[in-house]
Amino acid sequence: MSEKEKKMLMQLQEMNQADGYLEAHRTVKEPMELLGGPISFTIQQNSGGVFVALPDNRELDSDVFGTPKMPLAFTGTPGITGVPVPFRNVEDGQFTTLKRKTPFGDKNTTMANGNLMLKGTDVTATDAANTEDQVKMKASWEDKEGNTYAVRCCEMMVSSGPEFPTFGGVVTNHILHGFTGIGTPLMPSEYTYAAFWGMGAVLKNGEVVDKPRVVHGMLTEYVRGENYKLVSDSEVTPTRRHFHLMVAPFMPVKGEHKFQHKNVSTGFQLPNGMELPFWHVMFENLDISSERGE
């Protein structure tokens, strides 16, 4: 990274719009509880495959990213909370695609034997120093060579977000991503029935290959189209749901309220010989249950 790029990165991180809100919450030791009481939920997949995202150049939705004359969603760590304007391709006065490949795009592959067991409880309403939110999750899938990949979470919840709110680590019945400023705008704005952020581990064939990692999962309305294209906001399907599992190539900077790039050790080799630097896995054959109360 050049000195000019480093300076731009620092400026964009300092401009993060959620900083004031997060500062007010991150030292709270006795946060308020969810209105109406806790929500407990279970999300399972016991058969079928999964869709695994591959690095791709995301098409940029003008509703989320604006135009070259009036850009939107550019502050914060690139890829986490914004996309710098210099990282965007322009044609005929409009943003077209991201210049860099990320976990968010249309390219994907399928893998077999997708299994997911997730039990979560949303108790704490807001970001805070302490949380009663909980998630226990194990997800796994298998490549064509018979290797099994897995992600486990959560040894601890991310009770307060470095750059955007995490609502104690678990949030239910909210809108995330896209225009919201909560999570990367490279995903469409999507109604989210349940989501979590926590610290977990990445495994291959039963052996831990990367730990600790920030793990994000969410049950959302459907944001894929024909040929599994990642759609724009106007193309979201509100009457279908799927579960996204994300281990992003970023980690929080210790002692600071920002992220830095750090590839995930997945153990999965891409056709070009490089290791896939993230996991972005979609589960679609779901059994879902929920109730008020712990």
Question: Where do the protein language model's features map onto the residues?
Answer:
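Sec-dependent, cleavable N-terminal signal peptides
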Residues: 1-4
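Predominantly extracellular/secreted and cell-surface proteins with exposed
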Residues: 88-213
